[in-house]
Amino acid sequence: MAIMRGNVQKTLAGGERHTFRLHLAYSIIEGFILGILALNEFVFIKSLSGSDYELGILFQFSMLVFLLLVFVNEFLKRIRRRRIFLRWVGIITRFPLLLLFFFPRSPEVYQNGASWHMIFLAIFLVYYLAALVINPTINLLLKNNYSHQNFGTLYSYSQSANKVVLLVVTFLYGLLLDADNYAFTYIFPVAGVLGMVSVFLLSKIDYTPPEIIRIKTTFGQSVKNSMQNMYLILKNNRPYLHFEIGFMLYGIAFMTTYAVMTIFFYNALGLNYSSVAFYKNGYNILAILLLPLFGRIMGRLDPRRFAIITYTSLAGYLFFLILTEYLPYFTTIWGLKIYYTLIFYVISHGFFAASMVLLWNIGSAYFGDDHQADIYQSTHLFLTGVRAIFAPLAGIFIYQQLGYT
C-alpha cells in the first residue's frame, strides 16, 4: 500500500497530492469503523437478542436518513464556515457511540426488555445522520481537487486502503466476539473517538466555494426550491435520470434482501461470528484487487454502462445464496463453516463490492459540473431514502410470510 501511495503521489499536482493524503488517511480510519459496523446487524440479533423487524429498522435507519437531504441541502448552502460545521457534525454524531460502554453484559437483560434495543437503535440513528453532511461533502471536495482523469483512479486507491483495513478489522472483531459476545461495549467507544478524528482530517481538505449571489428567501421556500431543483435535474439531464432509474430498481432488490441475509446466516446456517465475518467480508479480498482496475474503467466509461457489472454481480451472489438452502453442504476449517455454494457467493460479491463502492459514492459526480457534485449526490442519496421507506421492512415481511427463497 505504501508503494502504491508513493507511485501515485509522484504523478500528482500539489493540490491533488495534499487532498489524496488527507482522503487516504480518512479512508483508512473509516475502514476500521466500517469493519466494526460490518457485524453490527449480527451483533444486534445474536448478542442483544433483537427481533427481525428491529433488525430491519436498524438497517433502514442507515438509508432512511437521506430523506432529510431536501432540508439539509438548503441548510448547508447557508453555512459559510462549512469546515467548522463538518467538525461539529463529527463530534455530535460519533460521541453517542461512547455510551455503548455502559451497556449490560448479560443476555437475560436483552431478552426480557426492549428498552436497550431502542437505545441501541437511537445511537445508530444519530450516527447515520452524519452521512447527510459527509457524503455530499466528500464528492464536492474531491471533485474540486482532483482532475477528471484522476478522479476515479485516486478514489479507487483510497477505497482499496479502506477495504484492506476493513477486511482485517472485521475478521479480528469476529474472533473477538466469539470469545466475548459483548466486546462491542468497549470496541464501539474506540470507534467513536476514531470517527471524530477521521471527520477532522476530512475537514482539512481545501475548498473555496464559488461566489454566488443568492436571493434571500425563507427556509420553507428554500426547501421547495431544493425539491424543484432535484426534479429539474432528473427532468433535464436524461442520462442522469436513466442512471437513477437503474439505481432505484437495484436498490429495492438490495434493501429487501440485506437484513434477511443476516437472519439467514444466523437461523438457517447457524454461523458463529467468525464465519459471518468471513462471508460478509471475505469478498473484500477480491474487491481490493479489482478496485484499481474498476477505478480506471469508470474514468473512461459511462457510469450507466459500468453499472452492468454491479447489477449482474448482485444477481449472481443472491443466486448462490439461495442455492445454499437447497445444497447445504459444507466443511469446517479453523472453526469456520465453509459452504461450497457460498464460495461462489463470495466471488460474485467481490465484483459487486468493488464496482458498487465506486458507482454509489461517485457515479453521480460524472453527470454534472464540478460545483454541482454535491447537488447531484444529494439527489442520488435522497432517492436512496425514498426506497428505504418501504424496502427493508418489506423484505422482512416477505421472508416471514414466504420464507428465505
List each language-model region with its residue ranges.
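Helix-loop junctions on the cytosolic side of multi-pass membrane transporters
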Residues: 199-217
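A helix-boundary/kink motif common to multi-pass secondary transporters
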Residues: 51, 80-82, 147, 181-183, ...
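Helix-loop boundary and gating motifs at the non-cytosolic
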Residues: 2-69, 73-76, 83-87, 99-101, ...
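C-terminal ends and interior cores of transmembrane alpha-helices
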Residues: 90-114, 312-335
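Substrate-agnostic recognition of the 12-TM MFS/MFS-like secondary transporter fold
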Residues: 21-40, 58-73, 89-93, 118-119, ...
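Helix-to-coil boundary motifs at intracellular loop junctions of multi-pass secondary transporters
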Residues: 47-48, 78-79, 141-145, 264, ...
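Cytoplasmic membrane-interface "Motif A"-like loop-to-helix N-cap segments
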Residues: 78-95, 182, 299-314
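Primarily residues marking transmembrane-helix entry/exit sites
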Residues: 16-24, 113-121, 236-244, 335-343
